[in-house]
């Protein structure tokens, strides 16, 4: 689909997609059991700012030009889409808008799949806050348990 969008810089979009959450490495402190807590730096600055700062520093060391660095940082800083969703700024270029929507689809699908996992086939959930809708698990969509799919390999 994106190949039909003539004005999309796919290299920039792919780089932004890969790096948009890189700041979470510094925002969160995760222990060996997978439990996470926010770091002081992460709480004060947020993962978008920390990621944009890191990406800018590394890109300069690699010799990228300043406009490309600025645009990559813009994707990272604006990937939440709206300031009320904790975006530092709003998308101002097509690649940033596309990245925001990719990130939203990822978030929606995670919520949808997590909700559906707790349902029996043919069952409907209550209203899911983050989706602002209910979720239905079709009778034909019965995902295999992880152990079953591992045994078949």
PLM ranges: what are they?
Residues 3-118:
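Divalent metal-dependent catalytic cores for phosphoryl transfer on phosphate-bearing substrates
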Residues 95-153:
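Acidic, carboxylate-rich catalytic segments that either coordinate divalent cations
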